[in-house]
Amino acid sequence: YHYGFCIDEDGVSEEWLNVKAKTRTTYRSIFYRNRADDELDLSGLPKDLQKNIHLSLNKGALIISLGSKLKIDICIQVYNWFARNKTVDFANLIGALQMYTSMPPGFAEDIQLQSNVVHFLSSFDKSIQGFKVEKVDTGERKGLKIWTKHKKIDSDSFQLLPLQEESAGTLKMIALYSFLQEVLDKGSVLFVDELNARLHSLLMRNILLMFLNPNLNPNHAQLIFTSHDTNHLTKNLLRRDEIWFTKKKNGKSELYSLAEFESDGGKKIRKDVNYEKNYLLGMYGAIPELTSINLFGENKYGKK
């Protein structure tokens, strides 16, 4: 499927859905709309439902959503693909703080789930041996009090540590657990903004390797993430078509793939070059325009 739409302050300005069989090289159009040209082509949809869509369509509605409500199979398939996907926004500080203090659904009662989380955390922190969970109900507020169990050195007993006192990286991994588990189980797509925030580079690489390992990811789940960590710009981890850059100019962001990038000589980027080094040298664009930092304007020596 090839689906997309454009929106502006007046609503949907363009929308299209094209489809092709895996054995074919060309797409056929299912529908297309273009407000600027006053064009609406629904010829690829069932004829008996085209009139219903035409009458129900407004500037704020998507054909794919209307088609799904009308039980049109091809629209349902595309709509459900988006519905199964998960989005995590760690760039939103308030939302991120809420995620850091939340646990997977059913965590308090499900001992097996708690064990699964411990096993997940053991990939980078073997000191956490379990959890202690208490339900809190003061009448005004309901919630959970959670401690992590750490085995004492040279002892069979445990030290309890309030969950909120764990490192930010541990809290983020706990927040990610249910999202990772669900998309890997369903074979859907996980979108994560600022995946690298609060995570060690090697830990983040471990997450990428999990998606790249067919034994751990048999359902072909996908991970799409933003990051400022350049350590992963390497051919040993990612293909050129898996690396995308965003270049900001005049309030707009342009998105382009390393596979599409051409040098000044018009040549494609070779697979054997050092992606990270070339990126930091500015060869691929998408880097900030920096000048020397001066916090105080004129300093005590009279220089700016």
Predicted regions span which residues?
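Electropositive, glycine-dotted interaction segments
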Residues: 1-137
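A short, compositionally biased
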Residues: 8-13, 140-145, 239-240
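Short polybasic amphipathic segments
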Residues: 13-20, 144-152, 244
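Short, solvent-exposed cationic patches
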Residues: 33-40, 277-287
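Amphipathic, soluble alpha/beta structural segments
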Residues: 48-75, 202-215, 228, 281, ...
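Extended helical coiled-coil dimerization/tether regions that scaffold
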Residues: 95-165, 275, 283-284, 288-289, ...
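Switch/communication elements of ASCE P-loop NTPase nucleotide-binding domains
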Residues: 152-283
